[in-house]
Amino acid sequence: MHTLITRRILLLAAVLVVFSSSLVVAQGTTEWLTLGGDYAHTRSTLADEITAENFAELDVAWEWDGASFGAVSGRSTPSLIDGKLYTVAGNKRYVIALDPKTGETIWSYREPDTPRGEYSMRADYGKGVGYAKIDGRGVIYIISPGFFLTALDAETGVPIEGFGRPVPIDGFPQTGVVDLLADLGHPYDPYEGLPLETGYITSSSPPLVVNDVIIVGNSAEQGYHQSRIENVPGDILAYDARTGALKWKFNVIPQPGEYGHETWENDAWEWTGDVSSWAPLSADPENNLVFIPTNSATIDYYGGFRPGDNLYGASIIALDTRTGERAWHFQMVHHEVWNFDNPTAPVLLDLNMPGRGSVPAVMQVTKQSWVYAFDRITGEPLWPIVERPVPASIVPGEVLSPTQPHVTKPAPYDIQGITIDDLADFTPEIRRQAIEALADYQMGPLFNPPIHAGNSTGKFAAMNCPGGGG
């Protein structure tokens, strides 16, 4: 398995060996500087040496075996920077620099072991590294499963002198590290982490460095595995890229006096949480904006204990990178109970629109088969997004929003909702089997509500299409 999975990383590296001179991304360079290739998260290149005609002629130049670093899932997108390839691997989230010509390991860095890192549910989910050039020196930034931010010299892998603050744990470097838990404002033990009865937080996506500001998202316990309704909010943190000093914190669950606080009834804002940003971030450096795609509030399929729309759950938030002030936001799903969290970074592009000319846009692809499109400066939808009635819940104590936002354009890219007419009918026998297989399930529209055991319909469960996996 290790060989197969690491090959996904390494074949990309091998292609970069041959064609790196033609890699051009949105920053106007020949490099791949961020997880998405560029700040706009286009994951695209203007390179034209690889074509449909010559693709079959590509050969593997080398392979790098990540098994020695505990690589299992292989979720990382390598970065190509200043002639080196940077990636992360394994449950320990090693940071590794490779020679793209030979595949040889130049250096590696591993954070010392801690219980808070060991029990991280997203330990092997590392997606990549952050990068910035600070005062002429390349710096690699990494967020560990234990939720530490480390700054490393891109040439040597040595923690940056003068960055961060000492961590009171044996084995940690005395410089180069920031304990991110310290800035969330909850009691915790530096070694053990947050008490499990308080909540859980970690990270899988790398930080994004915009105009010398490190912006840190986070990940909570997976909503479909949550065992408690108590949790901590996944607040967005930002740090000075030179010193590691905290610059600002944005509360993803609004506190008293903040915009949106009234969307949390039952005082749930005090003791529940999530609304994290496990998906990557994107940014518009010219306009000092970072775009945050958020997760649902705690527990994916039931929210009776948190009545209200629950801002900023299942939203896109545009923040000023300098201050953390909210420029605008849009909530895709009110009081989310379908696992319809935003699963990927917003994509930035400029659209030529009739009567409007070139419009700076941001697009959020979602699990519910819609692409939400906005003016990225003002937050105005580029096409109408209308509130339409949706079914109510029959689950005791659950009060869903009576309406949900519906995108009118672009058209959905996949089926939304499911009826008996959508079932397979290749032959009469296949159709009969399909109907029988789903007889105990409640079919319905896109926002078909979850149901509970022993419900009055006699159905075993409700079906969602698309489901929580998109």
Predicted regions and their residues:
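Bacterial N-terminal signal peptides that target proteins for export
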Residues: H2-L12
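Bacterial N-terminal signal peptides
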Residues: L11-S22
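Mature N-terminal segment immediately following signal peptide/propeptide cleavage
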Residues: Q27-F69, L80
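Repeat-blade elements of multi-bladed beta-propeller folds
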Residues: W32-G36, A71-Y94, S120-F148, G199-R228, ...
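Extracytoplasmic/lumenal domain signature
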Residues: E53-A67, V95-Y119, D135-G136, L149-E197, ...
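PEST-like low-complexity, intrinsically disordered acidic/proline/serine-rich tracts
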Residues: Y86, V359, P412-G470
